[in-house]
Amino acid sequence: MLAFCRSSLKSKKYFIILLALAAIAGLGTHAAWSSNGLPRIDNKTLGRLAQQHPVVVLFRHAERCDRSTNQCLSDKTGITVKGTQDARELGNAFSADIPDFDLYSSNTVRTIQSATWFSAGKKLTVDKRLLQCGNEIYSAIKDLQSKAPDKNIVIFTHNHCLTYIAKDKRDATFKPDYLDGLVMHVEKGKVYLDGEFVNH
């Protein structure tokens, strides 16, 4: 009974934190919640969250060359020229509020190119585990975070990874477009989904 009460209190405490997060997000966006039920977290809100604890932001890669009529950057398995411009624009806006972060990507051309253009000059670490989009993704995130517990992390991955996380953590249907993202954090060995990143 005591264990149940402790668990219930912990759940209530976390729910209250999530409500507070949604309220904070509402200060920076016109709507605090996306239509998929995820809290909306814009750049300024993300910056405030990062002051409370390190954040993990996962982005879908930029526009794929093999699924677009736009000009390819180079390799057909990579991204388009438009994709590089979009990634650079996103990176500039992101870095204005969170300049210090470690950068990772899965081992595909499109994620590597997206991460490179997102943050020109920053060291990029390629990790093939970030291509695995089941429970394994959480182990990879926790491992990366444990290497530098006080650092923010940016990961470039794939739409099916983001879809899986949103469904698994919040029972939300999330169909990310290019460069859409999710905001997470690791606390006491557990990975939490805070909401959907909205670039404003």
Curated annotation (Swiss-Prot):
Its EC number is 3.1.3.-. Pathway: Bacterial outer membrane biogenesis; lipopolysaccharide metabolism. Gene3D superfamilies: Phosphoglycerate mutase-like (3.40.50.1240). Catalyzes the dephosphorylation of heptose(II) of the outer membrane lipopolysaccharide core. This is Lipopolysaccharide core heptose(II)-phosphate phosphatase. HAMAP family: Ais (MF_01868). Residues 1-25 form the signal peptide. Keywords: Hydrolase, Periplasm, Signal. It comes from Escherichia coli O157:H7. The keyword Signal applies. The gene is ais. The keyword Oxidoreductase does not apply. InterPro entries: His_Pase_superF_clade-1, His_PPase_superfam, LipoPS_heptP_Pase.
